[in-house]
A protein has these predicted regions:
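Glycine/small-residue-rich phosphate/adenosyl-binding loop
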Residues: 49-134
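Short, surface-exposed beta-edge/turn micro-motifs
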Residues: 44-45, 121-124, 185
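C-terminal helix-cap and adjacent tail motif
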Residues: 6-13, 83-90, 185-217
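Solvent-exposed alpha-helices and their adjacent loops that cap or buttress functional pockets
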Residues: 39-42, 116-119, 176-180
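Short proline/glycine-enriched turn/loop segments at secondary-structure junctions
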Residues: 173-180, 200-202
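Short loop-to-beta-strand entry elements in the cores of soluble alpha/beta enzymes
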Residues: 40-51
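Small-aliphatic-rich amphipathic alpha-helix that forms the alpha element of a beta-alpha
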Residues: 28-34, 123-175
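Short acidic N-proximal helix/loop "leader" segments that mark the beginning
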Residues: 1-20, 24, 28-31
Length: 217
C-alpha cells in the first residue's frame, strides 16, 4: 500500500475483533513509528505496550477511575473555541451519534467508557515523553504517532488515538511502573477492525482546503 492511499483510507476505529495481534506485527509497526523525524534527532518518544491479561487489568483500573472521577471528553481548552472550530466537532458528533447510540448510553458515555477500555482492542499502547522536554517536543511525538497509525493501517490493522486517558496519568503510571519523570501524552488502541460494527460505519469530514490554507504568490 502506498503512503497516499494509507492516508486517504485510514480512520479511527472504535470496535475491534477478539483477534490477537502478533508481537512481531507490533514490533514492525513501532519500528516504522521511530523512523519519524525529530529535532536534532532527540527521538523524545517512548511506547509502553500492553496486551493480554495486563491490558485487561489496565482497562479495569481505568474504568474504575472513570466512575470515581467522571472525567469528561472535550477539547481541553481554557477558553471557548472559535465557532468555525467548534462547528467541526459538532458536525462530527452529529455524524457519529446515530451509529454509536444505544439504549441508556449517551454519546459522551460511549466515548468516555470506550476510551478507558481502548474500545475493546486487544492491544493498548501508552505514549509517554520525559517531562524535561518542553512542550514543543510534543510535535516530534505526534509525528511518530502518525507514522505508527499509518504503518498499522498498511499492515491491515486498525487504530484509534485516545487522549482522554492522559487524565488518568497517576493510575496508569502506578500500575505500569512509569517513572514520575515521564508524562503520559495519549493512548492508542490497536487491533483488527470489526467491520460489521455500526461504530465503524461512518467517516468524519475534513475541512475544505480553502478554510485552512493561505497562499502567497
Amino acid at each position: 500500500m502506498d503512503i497516499i492511499s494509507a492516508m486517504q483510507k485510514r480512520k479511527s476505529t472504535r470496535a475491534y475483533l477478539a483477534k490477537e495481534v502478533s508481537r512481531r506485527d507490533i514490533e514492525e509497526i513501532l519500528s516504522c513509528a521511530v523512523l519519524a523525524p525529530s529535532a536534532i534527532n532527540l527521538q523524545p518518544w517512548e511506547f509502553i505496550v500492553t496486551y493480554g491479561d495486563e491490558k485487561e487489568r489496565l482497562v479495569r483500573r481505568l474504568l474504575k477511575a472513570r466512575l470515581e472521577r467522571q472525567v469528561k471528553c472535550g477539547p481541553g481548552t481554557d477558553n471557548p473555541l472559535p465557532e468555525r472550530i467548534s462547528l467541526r466537532a459538532k458536525e462530527a458528533m452529529a455524524i457519529m451519534e446515530p451509529h454509536i447510540s444505544a439504549p441508556g448510553q449517551t454519546f459522551n458515555q460511549f466515548i468516555e467508557e470506550g476510551s478507558c477500555s481502548f474500545y475493546g482492542a486487544p492491544v493498548a499502547i501508552i505514549v509517554v515523553i520525559d517531562k524535561l522536554f518542553p512542550a514543543i517536543r510534543y510535535l516530534d511525538v505526534g509525528l511518530a504517532v502518525s507514522y505508527l497509525l499509518l504503518a498499522a493501517h498498511a499492515k491491515g490493522l486498525a487504530t484509534c488515538p485516545i487522549g482522554l486517558i492522559a487524565a488518568y496519568n497517576d493510575d496508569i503510571s502506578q500500575m505500569l511502573n512509569i517513572s514520575e519523570e515521564k508524562e503520559i501524552l495519549l493512548g492508542i488502541s490497536l487491533g483488527y477492525a470489526d467491520e460489521n460494527s455500526p461504530a465503524n460505519a461512518f467517516r468524519t469530514r475534513r475541512a475544505d482546503l480553502k478554510e485552512i490554507i493561505t497562499w502567497y504568490e
